[in-house]
Amino acid sequence: MIIDVNSPLPGESINRAAPWTSYNSDYLIRVFGIIENFKGFPNTLGFFAANEVMNDLDTAEFNPQYIRAVQRDLKNYIAKHSTRTIPVGYSAADVREILQDTWAYMQCAHEDDHSSSDFFGLNSYVQADSSIALETYAYHICLM
């Protein structure tokens, strides 16, 4: 399992419109609780620090540093409270105008920097109607 530590309920995820309003101690207590509940299962492969927080140019302006801060906090918590290393990453929306920059920023690492993504997920949605060619949906571009 790769578990998203966030939920759609108010206060339980990064607010993409104003991330500074949601990244607080209550939020961290909640996400650390998710780690506590799943860290002991051998089939826990990783944790998503955030999922589709950036979905356009406007949300890509302020959110990246908050996502990396959550990744750092999760990794530090896991290092102190788990008997094993559990990877932490980001799950991105398939928004082509920001996708490459998002990937580059999330995976960029420096010495002693624990905020980079261990993995990068991509949510690519396709409406599959078998009577219509996949090229109509541009899905063939994702496969390249």
Which residues fall in each region the model found?
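Solvent-exposed, polar/charged alpha-helical surfaces in well-ordered, non-transmembrane soluble domains
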Residues: 29-36, 42, 68-72, 76
